[in-house]
A protein has these predicted regions:
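A short mixed-secondary-structure module that forms the rim of ligand-binding clefts
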Residues: 1-14, 22
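Charged, gly/pro-rich active-site loop segments
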Residues: 15-122
């Protein structure tokens, strides 16, 4: 399934935007290589985990090597994290706008490829 959704909310403006699109996952290609070269060492350190995010563990831990401690990895060490790195490219196809108001909400949908918009029941 290549669908992707983004949801944004502004408490101040009382507006929610939900965008729907198609995602392409890039792994070990020119796009990821170019993006990886722009990352900082503190960001690369996050990709050095030996387990996947959300895996169950027995105790609270960061899953980073104990010898890493609070230090940043060397350039050579950081390259080991590239295998866990990807770029998610997304093309937004449509989005919905929702305005929350005590006198009645308002909702609209915009379909970008068709240059169409319509009102929806909130």
């Amino acid at each position: 399934n290549k669908k992707i959704y983004f949801v944004f909310y502004s408490k101040k403006r009382k507006i929610q935007v939900r965008a729907e699109g198609i995602a392409t996952i890039h792994k070990d290609n020119e796009i990821t290589k170019q993006a990886w070269t722009k990352t900082q060492m503190m960001s690369r350190k996050c990709y050095l985990s030996t387990q996947a995010p959300g895996d169950l563990i027995n105790e609270s831990a960061s899953d980073l090597s104990k010898d890493m401690g609070g230090s940043l990895p060397s350039l050579e060490q950081s390259e080991m994290g590239y295998k866990n790195f990807c770029v998610v490219e997304s093309k937004i196809k449509s989005f919905e706008w929702l305005y929350l108001a005590s006198q009645g909400h308002r909702r609209a949908k915009f379909i970008l490829d068709e240059n169409k918009s319509t009102w929806l029941v909130p």
